[in-house]
Swiss-Prot record:
One Gene Ontology term from the biological process aspect of the record: defense response
Domain of life: Eukaryota
Family: Belongs to the DEFL family.
Membrane among keywords: no
Protein name: Putative defensin-like protein 191
Residues of the signal peptide: 1-28
Positions of disulphide bridges: 33-79, 46-65, 51-74, 55-76
Assigned keywords, A-Z: Antimicrobial, Disulfide bond, Fungicide, Plant defense, Secreted, Signal
Originating species: Arabidopsis thaliana (Mouse-ear cress)
Any single Gene Ontology cellular-component annotation: extracellular region
Compartments where located: Secreted
Amino acid sequence: MAKSVNATGFITYMVIFLILTGISRVKAKKPPCLEGRTAYVSPGPCSNSLCTQDCRPAGYHTGKCKVEWSTPICKCYGCRKV
């Protein structure tokens, strides 16, 4: 009797593990995209919000502005939709 209880418990835990693993794999699927970044010289003032507004139409998630060698550079980051 003890062997059947242990076997039933093991099978139950194994089934639960496989179900949870399958659910996590389904949730992990993301739409196709290209991870990466691009950079361009910002024509206006250096502002992260303006960079984000410029990057969104190109499909990137966010933008950050940095001043490099006295030139405002806007860098787009995130997942670009394919």
